Amino acid sequence: MSKQQKILFIDRDGTLIVEPPVDFQVDRLDKLKLEPFVIPSLLSLQDAGYRLVMVTNQDGLGTDSYPQEDFDAPHNMMMEIFESQGVKFDDVLICPHFEKDNCSCRKPKLGLVKEYLQAGKVDFQNSFVIGDRQTDLQLAENMAIRGIQYNPETMGWKQILKDLTVKARVAEVVRTTKETDIKVFVNLDEQGGNAISTGLGFFDHMLDQIATHGGFQMVCKVEGDLHIDDHHTVEDTALALGQALKEALGDKRGIGRFGFSLPMDECLAQCALDLSGRPYLKFDAQFSREQVGDLSTEMVVHFFRSLTDTLACTLHLSSAGNNDHHIIESLFKAFGRTLRQAIKVEGTELPSSKGVL
């Protein structure tokens, strides 16, 4: 095992398998029962890059009160079931002592996991102890990692999987210059509740088109030097929005990455997008008017160029039609619809053969 791995140190009885409520020993095959959804959850956690280590106290294992052969039959069956379904444990760490023995390996003491800690194998920010007892949480504290208390009703395997693999894709960017004061918030996994105020009514409407057709939430508050013109307001808003989208995407693991969309309204709007990590814009649209509403038409291409710079994406965007209002709107709608495809989470893999985006 390489250094600094994401490791889940998982309790056995009451967490992976049901703990008998009377004698607390799984010492016969007919007492073996898996906890709900444990196998599909562990498989998904493995796919997300977690290594699995079982850590369990087995009171008096190997004594008359708990003969080794009584333990082995159901335990080996459990391991065979896990392995047959693709669940692989790097280690199975067992303390066989009674609490009164005052050994160094019984949870929550560190004896069982000492090698992992001393060898630098644990990614302390992204490793967890999962178990149903307070001693499991104490073990986590002693290891200086986080603990999750398993409960089939309130914190079952489905919820644990969600908590460990679904990270909130949100970001807030504050950008302040001599010309503008901007705050942009995006939540890529929520829709509705958009609140956009730039001082430019038509521009507000266009930004709302991106969020609405992109399927995400945007809150954008801008104060700019509109007494001069709209240049700084549009440019800096694009820079802040692109940065917010990039930060919300994180490492881009699991996203679609690519998107393509056409047409929009009566205009033929075409958009192709790659969240490649490399800024590039190819833009093709002609306007017959200098302004639509309070937005300068020359700022449309400048908006998308600034956005691609901070989002770090490759964008091909074009539209043709007879009405400038509809042409501009089709560009923003097409971009939003294409972005929706590209940011959608489809799995857990990074969509790049290079291993980084």
From Swiss-Prot:
Put simply, this protein is called Histidine biosynthesis bifunctional protein HisB
Q: Which HAMAP family match?
A: Bifunc_HisB (MF_01022), HisB (MF_00076)
Q: Known InterPro entries for this protein?
A: HAD-like_sf (IPR036412), HAD-SF_hydro_IIIA (IPR006549), HAD_sf (IPR023214), His_synth_bifunc_HisB (IPR020566), HisB_N (IPR005954), Histidinol-phos (IPR006543), IGPD_sf (IPR038494), ImidazoleglycerolP_deHydtase (IPR000807)
Record-annotated residues binding Zn(2+)? 95, 97, 103, 105
Q: Name one GO molecular function term.
A: histidinol-phosphatase activity
Q: Which reaction does it catalyse?
A: D-erythro-1-(imidazol-4-yl)glycerol 3-phosphate = 3-(imidazol-4-yl)-2-oxopropyl phosphate + H2O; L-histidinol phosphate + H2O = L-histidinol + phosphate
Q: Give, as in the UniProt entry, the pathway in which the protein acts.
A: Amino-acid biosynthesis; L-histidine biosynthesis; L-histidine from 5-phospho-alpha-D-ribose 1-diphosphate: step 6/9; Amino-acid biosynthesis; L-histidine biosynthesis; L-histidine from 5-phospho-alpha-D-ribose 1-diphosphate: step 8/9
From the Swiss-Prot or TrEMBL record, state where the protein is found.
Answer: Cytoplasm
UniProt organism field:
Vibrio vulnificus (strain YJ016)
Q: Which cofactor does it need?
A: Mg(2+); Zn(2+)
Annotated region Imidazoleglycerol-phosphate dehydratase: the residues are 169-357
Q: What is the lineage of its organism?
A: Bacteria, Pseudomonadati, Pseudomonadota, Gammaproteobacteria, Vibrionales
